[in-house]
Amino acid sequence: MTQDGSAPANSAEHPWPVRSVSVKVMQWIDRLGSIWVEGQITQINLRPGARTAFLVLRDPSADMSLQVTCDPELIRRSPVPLQEGSRVVVYGKLVFFPARGSISLRVLEIRPVGVGELLARIERLKALLAAEGLFDERLKRPIPFLPKVVGLITGRGGAAEHDVLTVARNRWPAVRFEVRNTAVQGPTAVPQILTALAELDRHPEVEVIVLARGGGSVEDLLPFSDEALCRAIVAATTPIVSAIGHEPDNPLSDYVADLRAATPTDAAKRVVPDAAAELALVRELRARSAAALRGWVDREARALAQLRSRPVLADPLREIDRRATEIERLRADARRCVRHLIRTESTATAHLREKLTAVGPAATLARGYAVVQRVTGPERHVVRSIADSPAGSQLRIRVADGAVSAAALGTTAAGTRIADDTGGN
């Protein structure tokens, strides 16, 4: 102890003795005071003549329990007989036993949780989950048509397991199951179901999980309305079918599951197809396909026969011959038109040639006219005026039958009397 009476700081050099730890635990428990606790009775030890009754109170949603002691009269005077599996609310104070380092709850009052209260709690939880959107249809995952492996969570050796396996194998003999047997009622049900659900959800071949139980009372079905289980179903990646088989008060697992089945038998029918029905459907579809194909072939054959009966196909050369005759006629008409056009144009051309000849230079020269050209080196220019041919110019005179070379001796203006050959300029 320190000088002020307090315990020294705890360390490896200054460890607390067990008695100090026990004292601190008792002090903390004393400060906690009396408390209300809810749980499920898993064990009752009520010996005749004993002054103390011993119970074990378990949390339905977790693998945790608490030792409870009480006056035996509290159990005997309970308005509802208390038994293993009963849900209760107790009032008492924790007691620490230093000698063995254990804690027990000394109970002064026990209140059984009735069916009405249980249903009210379920309704409150249902409203909470609905407000969070956990019942939304958009969250529902589709059930595979033919799953590789079906996971099954159910009680060991119960009717639910037998019904699911028998019905499923009768419908599809090759179906495979991964079965996890758990408690389906009582305080251990929820932890075991959660463990099995996690295992099957991780299984690489399990494509759908069936949670099955063959009905029961409200108290028996409480695990399937547990909040932890409902949230685990929503969080799972594998589609889950809830087949608890209880009407009309459905457990909450029915609302959060991807598919609700009325019974385990119904669940087997919903997750596995009926091989006989599928074969019958295949046969029906094959028959319908064959009938449709035959009908199509018949229609096409009739259409082909109609086409073959048409004249153009019955005697295809007839149309070719008719077209050939028409083409030959058109060719003869074309030749006739071309010859007529050539004759017409030839006559017109001859007339034009005659006109050109009559007005052309050669005809004019033939009538005694001449064309006078002044020769300047290699160039020749037609003389149209006396100014174009001054005296001394070299001239070329073209007549009808040739040309004459001459020289200009002089010029005489129009209207001037021409003198004799020796006069003039």
From Swiss-Prot:
Q: Does the keyword Nucleotide-binding apply?
A: no
Highest taxon listed in the record's lineage: Bacteria
Enumerate the HAMAP family for this protein.
Exonuc_7_L (MF_00378)
Main localization, broad class: cytoplasm
Record's catalysed reaction(s): Exonucleolytic cleavage in either 5'- to 3'- or 3'- to 5'-direction to yield nucleoside 5'-phosphates
Q: Give an example GO molecular function.
A: exodeoxyribonuclease VII activity
Q: What is this protein called?
A: Exodeoxyribonuclease 7 large subunit
Query: What are the protein's UniProt keywords?
Result: Cytoplasm, Exonuclease, Hydrolase, Nuclease
Question: Which biological process, per GO, is one annotated for this protein?
Answer: DNA catabolic process
Name the Enzyme Commission number(s) assigned to this protein.
3.1.11.6
How the protein assembles, per its UniProt entry?
Answer: Heterooligomer composed of large and small subunits.
Function of this protein? Bidirectionally degrades single-stranded DNA into large acid-insoluble oligonucleotides, which are then degraded further into small acid-soluble oligonucleotides.
**Family per record:** Belongs to the XseA family.
The UniProt entry's GO CC annotations, sorted and at most eight, read: cytoplasm; exodeoxyribonuclease VII complex
Instruction: Tell me the compartments it is located in.
Output: Cytoplasm
